Amino acid sequence: MRKMMSTMALTLGAAVFLAFAAATAQAQRCGEQGSNMECPNNLCCSQYGYCGMGGDYCGKGCQNGACWTSKRCGSQAGGATCPNNHCCSQYGHCGFGAEYCGAGCQGGPCRADIKCGSQSGGKLCPNNLCCSQWGFCGLGSEFCGGGCQSGACSTDKPCGKDAGGRVCTNNYCCSKWGSCGIGPGYCGAGCQSGGCDAVFAGAITANSTLLAE
């Protein structure tokens, strides 16, 4: 009996630790706002100190990780490739959008390389990349935002309690209305999961309640 109680205690302790770790990962702070910590898996640290992917994290103000504007690549960098399948522009910089993935693109999901969607007979993108409204594969708001046809689209995915507890891809926020996206309307008050501004406290409370039951 004593051995069984000991095993149960160890199991409960492990569950509490894993719940704590999961909650911490969801609300990962980084950069100046997070004791200069770097994000896991080379995720971008936004100017506000949160980890994630997409323009709000990897664009202007990005502090570390796979920032779009800080990585050199291509012939200007000894043939180096961009992280996270970003495009390498003709000038040797990593990023997304026409200036990176368009004319002269040296590597990554260049527009001339990977086509998809209704423009290509319904073809899907590899690795769950987003298929933009124009029929090209990639990541970021230009591909995963309005008009996204397939893949990890950010704005048309149901999530949260009304979608069976589903979470958003790429650490996008699940708004209080149950849709995936980035910005105050998604990550602010009522945010259910993802990179929410205040997800840590809510996640700990929810996990503690679950364990207590």
Swiss-Prot record:
A Gene Ontology molecular function term of the record: chitin binding
Propeptide, chain numbering: 199-213
Superkingdom of the organism of origin: Eukaryota
This protein's record includes keyword Signal: yes
Matching Gene3D superfamilies: Endochitinase-like
Signal peptide start and end residues: 1-27
Ranges of residues in domain Chitin-binding type-1: 28-69, 70-112, 113-155, 156-198
Protein residues bound to substrate: 37-39, 89-100, 141-142
Keywords recorded for this protein, A-Z: Chitin-binding, Disulfide bond, Lectin, Pyrrolidone carboxylic acid, Repeat, Signal
Keyword Repeat: yes
Disulfide bonds: 30-45, 39-51, 44-58, 62-67, 73-88, 82-94, 87-101, 105-110, 116-131, 125-137, 130-144, 148-153, 159-174, 168-180, 173-187, 191-196
Biological function: N-acetyl-D-glucosamine / N-acetyl-D-neuraminic acid binding lectin.
SUBUNIT field: Homodimer, u-shaped.
Further remark: The 4 sites proposed for binding to carbohydrates (N-acetyl-D-glucosamine) of receptor molecules are on the surface of the agglutinin molecule.
Protein name (database record): Agglutinin isolectin 2
Source organism (scientific name): Triticum aestivum
Phylogenetic placement of the source organism: Eukaryota, Viridiplantae, Streptophyta, Embryophyta, Tracheophyta
